[in-house]
Amino acid sequence: MKEKTNDPASPREVGSVRLGGITGRVAHPAAPGEALAGGPQMVEVSRDGKRIYVTNSLYGSWDDQFYPDGVGSWFAKIDTDPAAGGGLTVDEKFFPRGDDFRGRRVHQVRLGGGDASSDSYCYPS
């Protein structure tokens, strides 16, 4: 995942993190020995822009096609600081995965109280 400035006259990268993947399968810092299948598929940004929530399952049939040995389930949080100009950091303490989801695949993040960007239309600013 990459973060770029929002200045169209002067775009530049201000942050980058890697998790999972088809070939690299980059591990989460909380479990460095555990190669992650899948990559961030569903992305939700907190309403204040300081947290990015990502999950790894897109659609079951596609997951099975691209990851025949299994995609598993994982959910990660990436922190950013818009006031400081950006930058991305994987939250090392937040990493539900595998058995935390009782065999289910994790697809989309829906947070009560409207913390995610897709909930913005439900709550007054």
What are the functions of these language-model segments?
Residues M1-S125:
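Feature marking well-ordered beta-strand scaffolds used for ligand recognition
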